[in-house]
Amino acid sequence: MSKQVTLMTDAIPYQEFAKLIGKSTGAVRRMIDKGKLPVIDMTDPQSASGRAGEYWVYLPAWNNGLKLAYESRPKEIRDGWLMWLGLGEPR
């Protein structure tokens, strides 16, 4: 049986997100720097700069983006895997 990931929060540190998607923390940090991830920049009200230096990935936005990307694919590509299960329509 495969493992199921259950999270009790909508945001996780980018280092944990890297583990979830099988990428290095450096790769995920570069994705953040290029604006490719929905992140929350944690702030420290006690700090002079206001920045805590922590990025957390907002999972609902990530999941919505993946769903949109998947559903935007052409039907024959998006549903092609169903053919292998005998559930898709023949081309």
From Swiss-Prot:
One Pfam family hit: Phage_Cox
Record's keyword terms, sorted: DNA-binding, Early protein, Repressor, Transcription, Transcription regulation
InterPro entries registered for this protein in UniProt: Cox_sf, Phage_P2_Cox
Gene Ontology terms for molecular function: DNA binding
Lineage: superkingdom: Viruses
Functional description taken from the UniProt entry: Repressor of the Pc promoter which controls gene C, which codes for the immunity repressor, and int, whose product promotes the site-specific recombination over att.
Similarity comment: family membership: To phage HP1 cox.
Protein name: Regulatory protein cox
Source organism (scientific name): Escherichia phage P2 (Bacteriophage P2)
